[in-house]
């Protein structure tokens, strides 16, 4: 569709856009952690979502008429729990798949960030996971780049 409207492929347009500098003065931070810790935290987060009522939430959405074919039901958590509710597999399997798919999503995000230019990686381990230290570092970078006065 883009090609038909503009006469150039979308890939050429995207390449041209990458070459342009942003009109904004910004810093692009990515908080990073060792993969084993990241995956452990993902597993705990999924467990927390379940404890806080993910299954009941999806049951309610299903009662309201939401179904598998809807884009809104394709999000992480919804599609796995919906498959469980529809008898596709037991809850334990739905949870296993949700954790696996969330880990895969996190891996894809990190891959995407690595391709970005001007990313400032913040390895949380180097700051002993101390949020105050991380914030102080980020503020110092912002001051260095004249983003903060």
Enumerate the language-model features and the residues they cover.
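Phosphate/pyrophosphate-binding catalytic cores of soluble transferases and nucleic-acid-acting enzymes
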Residues: 1-149
């Amino acid at each position: 569709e883009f090609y038909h409207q503009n006469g150039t492929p979308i890939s050429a347009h995207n390449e041209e856009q990458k070459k342009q500098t942003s009109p904004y003065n910004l810093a692009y931070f990515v908080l990073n952690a060792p993969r084993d810790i990241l995956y452990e935290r993902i597993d705990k987060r999924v467990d927390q979502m379940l404890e806080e009522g993910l299954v009941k939430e999806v049951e309610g959405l299903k009662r309201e008429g939401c179904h598998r074919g809807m884009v809104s039901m394709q999000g992480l958590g919804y599609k796995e729990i919906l498959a469980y509710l529809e008898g596709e597999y037991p809850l334990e399997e739905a949870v296993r798949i949700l954790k696996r798919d969330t880990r895969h999503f996190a891996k894809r995000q990190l891959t995407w960030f690595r391709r970005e230019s001007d990313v400032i990686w913040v390895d949380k381990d180097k700051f002993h996971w101390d949020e105050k230290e991380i914030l102080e570092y980020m503020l110092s970078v912002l001051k260095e780049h004249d983003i903060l006065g």
